[in-house]
């Protein structure tokens, strides 16, 4: 079932306009002009909610509205960073915008053109750039690096008597730990310390906040900021959020809080064993003994405040015959039930060169794993 409401385009346009930036203002004018052709948009919300961890989504005119800067946000250096960047911002947002009170909408305020200008270097041609101007130095320690990698917007809507309206915004700021560049045709890189990254991120967040608040419709809208530290290209764990803050009004953020997150890749290398790593090592050993031709068995464990919040196990196999996949999935299920943590959500993904072959999910209420084999 879906709830169906009608939302005036002019009202929506006033909400999503961004007078602080000429490009967004122009986009808003185009949206207003298009309302002459149609007086209303049909906005629907899904009534089914998979769990309290998920937001119900809004659908406009029967279609899911993608993020206005979607093309720009796909440019982080690894898929692991991109995944953590997007899902981590939702995790931060839940504490400010409860899932039982707010609906999720992909960002509709900051468009791709504006994002591209903001994440570029500041210059005479691009005064809105949030990265420092090129100082002409090409040495790793002397050049002005690209600090800001990406900006992600998520909108959180509330339901009123007759429609939906903007209830809050979350802005993710992805910052580089390593800036990759080319010098005389050769690959080079500049490492960025955590201290410098945080200093730059706070300044960038305040600038973005000021630009958003210049729009009357956004002066009193709560805006959550999350600072994400993007890891290097060879890190398969991916980055994490390191800072968060919420601005209720005004143009300065003064209430930054540290976010204690980390991603640990298993098996560990030269590190002290943990409860999760020991359980995984027992699981890995037994699975590989049963199927010695596996290409690899690894895991990623996400921690929040030093507590394991999720484990994702990846098993790569060289074979993909149906009988072999079934046998492997059955054995992995048995071993997972025997060794893997019972108090932490765990997923097991079995893949081959053709893609995912089987998927195991732990039923937390029963403490057992179930599996699905893909055709």
Model-identified regions with their sequence ranges:
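Bacterial signal peptide processing site
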Residues: 22-25
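Hydrophilic extracytoplasmic domains
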Residues: 271-375
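C-terminal motif of bacterial Sec signal peptides marking the signal peptidase cleavage site
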Residues: 17-20
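Short, non-transmembrane amphipathic alpha-helical segments
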Residues: 191-217, 323-345
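Bacterial N-terminal signal peptides that target proteins for export
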Residues: 1-9
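A solvent-exposed, charged loop/short amphipathic helix patch at secondary-structure junctions
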Residues: 179-196
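N-proximal, solvent-exposed amphipathic alpha-helical segments enriched in charged/polar residues
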Residues: 32-180, 198, 202-204, 232-303
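Extended, H/D-rich, highly charged conserved domains that either
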Residues: 211-222, 235-237
């Amino acid at each position: 079932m879906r709830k169906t409401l009608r939302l005036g385009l002019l009202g929506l346009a006033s909400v999503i306009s961004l007078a602080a930036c000429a490009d967004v203002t122009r986009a808003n004018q185009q949206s207003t002009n298009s309302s002459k052709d149609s007086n209303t948009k049909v906005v629907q919300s899904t009534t089914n909610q998979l769990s309290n961890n998920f937001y119900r989504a809004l659908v406009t005119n029967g279609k899911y509205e993608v993020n206005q800067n979607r093309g720009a946000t796909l440019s982080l250096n690894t898929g692991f960073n991109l995944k953590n960047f997007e899902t981590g911002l939702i995790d931060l947002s839940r504490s400010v915008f409860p899932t039982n009170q707010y609906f999720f909408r992909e960002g509709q305020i900051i468009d791709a053109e504006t994002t591209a200008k903001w994440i570029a270097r500041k210059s005479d041609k691009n005064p809105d750039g949030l990265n420092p101007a090129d100082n002409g130095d090409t040495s790793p320690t002397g050049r002005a690096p690209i600090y800001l990698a990406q900006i992600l917007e998520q909108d959180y809507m509330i339901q009123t008597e007759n429609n939906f309206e903007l209830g809050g915004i979350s802005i993710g700021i992805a910052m580089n730990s390593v800036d990759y560049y080319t010098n005389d045709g050769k690959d080079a890189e500049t490492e960025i310390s955590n201290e410098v990254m945080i200093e730059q991120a706070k300044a960038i967040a305040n600038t973005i906040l000021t630009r958003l608040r210049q729009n009357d419709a956004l002066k009193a809208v709560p805006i959550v900021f999350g600072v994400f530290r993007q890891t290097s290209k060879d890190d398969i764990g991916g980055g994490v959020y390191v800072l968060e803050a919420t601005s209720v009004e005004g143009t300065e953020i003064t209430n930054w809080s540290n976010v204690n997150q980390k991603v640990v890749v298993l098996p560990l290398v030269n590190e002290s064993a943990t409860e999760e790593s020991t359980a995984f090592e027992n699981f890995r050993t037994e699975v590989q003994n049963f199927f010695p031709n596996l290409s690899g068995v690894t895991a990623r464990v996400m921690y929040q405040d030093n507590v394991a919040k999720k484990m994702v196990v990846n098993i790569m196999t060289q074979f993909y015959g149906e009988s072999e996949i079934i046998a492997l999935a059955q054995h992995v299920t048995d071993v997972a039930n025997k060794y893997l943590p019972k108090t932490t959500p765990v997923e097991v993904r079995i893949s081959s060169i053709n893609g995912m072959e089987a998927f195991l999910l732990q039923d937390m209420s029963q403490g057992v794993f179930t599996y699905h084999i893909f055709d």
